[in-house]
């Protein structure tokens, strides 16, 4: 992907991470809270990113190489074509594997970009059940699995729209992210419309992160 166009796909080389591991996330266009990035990781150089979390949702796609994703006490090996979903406030990190250059594209966005705000049916029916369920912090997207392949195809369309920045690209980005999230909800969280009990470990971890975030500077 190039870095031209109004909605520039930026190269991610460094991150600002607070003491409580929250990543500082600023979107270039505040009225359109969505950022697209590319990163090149390789052992011996910049080989990934450290533990962090953010209030935004993240979707990544591996273009080449191998990347190991860590989240919720699990690790997932992502190969070229695979992807990864990271829910809001989920602690995670990535690390390149092998000696081949890893080229990764990712999208970070405020859920309200898709829902239009908490007072909409889109938020209440589709977005809230996904982002408020801490039993669902992440999801590996296997390019060889048909449903995951459809989700990954939506991500590719998002990057194409961001790269070309043709008139109306905001609609294309919002639509394709929304469809990807809907497929995630329907395929992996069929019970998400019901209140799920949070695992005690996840609940304690989030409580600790929230406490550190609000009280560290006092």
Name each region found by the language model.
Residues 1-83, 89-90, 124, 135-139:
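Generic protein-terminus/edge-of-domain signal
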Residues 86-87, 109:
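A conserved hydrophobic position in a structured secondary element of the catalytic/binding core
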Residues 137-148, 162-218:
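Short, Lys/Arg-enriched, Trp-marked, Pro/Gly-tolerant hinge/linker segments that flank
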Residues 68, 93, 215:
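Detector for the N-terminal beta1/A-loop initiation region of ABC nucleotide-binding domains
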Residues 9-35, 40, 95-159:
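A hydrophobic/aromatic-rich effector-binding and dimerization subdomain
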Residues 58-61, 150-154, 176, 183:
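Amphipathic, well-ordered alpha-helical segments in soluble domains
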């Amino acid at each position: 992907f190039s870095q031209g166009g109004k909605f520039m796909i930026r190269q991610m080389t460094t991150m600002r991470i607070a003491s409580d591991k929250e990543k500082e996330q600023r979107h270039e266009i505040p009225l359109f809270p969505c950022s697209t990035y590319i990163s090149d990781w390789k052992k011996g150089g910049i080989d990934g990113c450290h533990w962090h979390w953010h209030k935004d949702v993240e979707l990544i796609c591996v273009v080449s190489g191998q990347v190991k994703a860590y989240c919720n006490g699990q690790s997932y090996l992502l190969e070229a074509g695979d992807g990864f979903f990271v829910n809001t406030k989920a602690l995670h990190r990535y690390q390149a594997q092998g000696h081949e250059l890893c080229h990764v594209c990712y999208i970070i966005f405020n859920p309200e970009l898709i829902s239009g705000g908490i007072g909409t049916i889109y938020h209440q029916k589709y977005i809230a059940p996904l982002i408020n369920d801490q039993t669902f912090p992440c999801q590996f997207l296997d390019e060889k699995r048909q449903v995951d392949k459809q989700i990954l195809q939506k991500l590719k369309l998002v990057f194409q729209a961001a790269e070309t920045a043709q008139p109306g690209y905001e609609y294309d980005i919002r639509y394709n992210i929304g469809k990807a999230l809907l497929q995630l909800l329907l395929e992996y969280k069929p019970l998400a419309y019901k209140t799920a009990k949070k695992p005690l470990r996840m609940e304690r971890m989030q409580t600790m992160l929230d406490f550190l975030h609000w009280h560290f500077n006092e």
